[in-house]
Amino acid sequence: AITSLKYFSENAPGYHVIAAGSLLGIELHQGESFPVGKVDFLSLHPMSFIEFVMAMGDNNLARLLQSKEWNMITMFAPKFQELLKYYYYVGGMPEAVLVFSQSRNWEEVRKIQKGILNSYQRDMSKHAPSEIVPRITDLWKSLPAQLSKENKKFIYGVIREGARAREYEIALQWLQDAGLIYKVFNVKAPRLPLVSYEDRAAFKIFVLDVGLLGAMSNLKASTIVDGNSIFTEFKGALTEQYVLQQLILRYEPYYYARPNSTQEIDFLLQDDEDCIVPLEVKAETNVKAKSLRQFVTDNHSQKAYRISLNDYKQADWVTNV
């Protein structure tokens, strides 16, 4: 099917052909022939928070978010926080969003998410080399525990005691090629371009969707109505996953852990103006940001952002969003 696209490009250019495939990355890595230069790629991701708000029928609120009219946004903060709780639980997988928009039924949403996770397990067994299927499965199941650590750097020993990188590198690559995980590298130094300083041995792993992470972790729907506890579950794992999910739509995020120090910046971005922008993620309204302030001081950062439940505020060295 993939090779037929070359025919359409060369012999039937008047037709616009769209082809979809969930495991295309794996096929290409396995040496399948591909019509180079004949195909444009478009990566699809789970629905963003703004798209979720629109799917809930709140188009005016979605437009308000896009407008960045912060004074108005602050007035509707309780409503946005309610929708954000819903998004943490439902996530952005289209079928889960559709069912929730129609029924507001938490159990039906979870049933769909569990079905998606089961289909991923079947894909692992069907499409991955048989000798690495157990390692792929073990690695995949370890991700909630990886993200619930205080330090979210990926540790092979969390998969099983004594596990080593060489045993799981291929399994990790398979999950990445399948589009089931995002890999966020540490940078050895916060310098431009960030890609030149990435540390290939130090990274965080996130799953593709915050709702699926909740399903993998058996998060109960009761956390939705229990104050703001959903924002702090698993040491803020859902919050960091949520932020990553929005960033990945536009940027290639990194993070920075200063050597021989406790200083860590949750995400580093290289923006359109070639500025290095540090982001710190806070799951609550407690926004003490010692690491972020130190980073801004050391690197003379022009921009810095802190993501929290607090209202928008622009200070002299940081913007709270």
Predicted segment positions?
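Structural motif
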Residues: C275-V277, K303
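Interdomain motor-coupling "hinge/lid" segment immediately C-terminal to the ATP-binding subdomain
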Residues: S22, L28-S148
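Conserved catalytic network of the ASCE P-loop NTPase/AAA+ motor domain
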Residues: F8-Y15, S33-G37, Q270-D271
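Terminal-proximal interaction/regulatory segments of ATP-powered molecular machines
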Residues: V277-A283
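Conserved nucleotide-binding/hydrolysis micro-motifs of P-loop NTPases
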Residues: S22-E27, P46-I50, K188, L212-L213, ...
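Accessory nucleic acid-recognition modules appended to NTPase machines
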Residues: M93, L98-D271
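Catalytic cores of nucleic-acid endonucleases
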Residues: A283-N320
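Conserved catalytic/switch belt of AAA+ P-loop NTPases
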Residues: I2-G25
